[in-house]
Amino acid sequence: MGEAMTGLKRSHMCCDVSEVLIGSEVTVMGWVQRRRDLGQLIFIALRDRTGLVQAVVDGNNSAPELFKKAESVRSEYVLAIRGKVAPRTEGNVNKNMKTGAIEIIADELRILSESETTPFQVEDEITVKDDLRLKYRYIDLRRPCQLKNMILRHKTAQVIRNFLSDEGFLEIETPVLGKSTPEGARDYLVPSRVHPGSFYGLPQSPQLYKQLLMVSGMDRYYQIAKCFRDEDLRADRQPEFTQVDMELSFVDVDDIIDVNERLIKKVFKEILDVDVPIPMQRMKYKDAMERYGSDKPDVRFGMELHNITDIVRGTEFVVFKNAIEAGGSVRAINANGCGHYPRKQIDSLVEFVKTYKAKGLAWIVVNDDGSLKSQIAKFFTPEKLQEIVDALEGKPGDLILICADADRIVFDSLGALRCEIARRQELTRPDDFRFLWVTEFPMFEWDDEENRYVAEHHPFTCPMDEDLPLLDTDPSKVRAKAYDMVLNGFELGGGSIRIHRRDIQQKIFSLLGFSDEDAQERFGFLLDAFKYGVPPHGGLAFGFDRIIMLMTGSSSIRDVIAFPKVKDASCPLTDAPGTVDDKQLDELGIAIVKTEENEETNE
């Protein structure tokens, strides 16, 4: 049973109680971190979101009822304590606590709420399985590390809002219930009761609405928007996520990059006291792929890719020969200092790249005496092996790793491998922030399964002016006015200059396989708006959760979202998604049909 707060008002947060208040009466409220009983002295460490303060109940100088109540207190009880602030004796000062120089001599203690024994301790220095933490997320969030993440998230949002407001942006909310216009991933669908058989789509982004806001003359828009994607999860993705979304009129690529560089500089300085140098490095998509095997390269370390196709061309080694004849390439990285790896560890790298569809790896070890060891040595002359090593500036103690396949597989495999080796070798620090822009993405990517082009970003991205003629002759070579901000191997945000001409937009839809009727059905409202005067415009969206993850050094965005989902898009806390009763389904005109495999599908 809990007591009422009647007559008590909190005067201070726990960590606001300091030496300047010595002799003053304060009232604090919070959770019991721990209780120590030393006979006639009971010490209670009380915690709120600011931290801890110690309260003391002295059995020799307090009412028996107060002392008895203090004896009954247990961890995670919620208390209100009123008393006078006093200095701690010299031997009892705790320099590890912000309030370690003082304590509160309790005159009144109320137990506002009792607590059962928690499934895990509210401490940072504990190991708890993720499923248990997330099932009891409200307890997990009490831990200082989780509180710190939530507070940093709040402060970052405030800095962003203030900066964009000062830059002339208007914060405008766009609908959550919209039309399903898939942008690459599956939409979450919401059935309409009023319009049987029709569905809303939850937004993957506010893309179309923010373009309409530019047509409306809003000039500069932003919102911190909730977005949804029904896709497989990974460490840095969630089915519902938050974007810092913006759109600007009468701008070019440089304008958008400039405002976002200054935004990031402001955020990192005010929140982390980190100076981000601007202008940031820019790298064309083609160069990023050639050098790092990724369109979101981690540039905190080297280990760049080298194209050795010409060096090994004409070889009888069938793996290299077949890759080259099929139009692929042979590329390599130099894992500096990894020549000491035992064969078992090298084999683990071979297995690693197989997850990226590579058939394997060739390797060359540069021994300490400069001699070479390789499983492909019998296929090459010593001079040819040395030529490969020299091309990668190999030196004693290095390990050369070679992949031969289609370009996409080689890039994916070596791009991931360099990051895996960097992880194993501890070549990076989470507090080393290396930003860059990747620009000039391909406009289209060919989808073999669907036998058509798909948009690399989305179908509203504007082609480079000089590439417009290629839309009619060779769409695969068209570059987009698109740009991604990358930080330490993660895409922080991406955007583009948009198409503002109706004729070009219709041509893009046609290249993507949309008939005029399909385009009108899906995007007719946008095409209609383009009849009435459209300013040149562009924008960008940052993954807010991902930014916070990187700023806090967390390994997953789950740690920076208050109530996240897990890999199967379920919520361990609420057991969502859940079933609904037949009456609700009947109102929506939906029936659940069990297939022969006993799987449930909506019909």
List each language-model region with its residue ranges.
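Class II aminoacyl-tRNA synthetase catalytic cores and aaRS-like
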Residues: 1-603
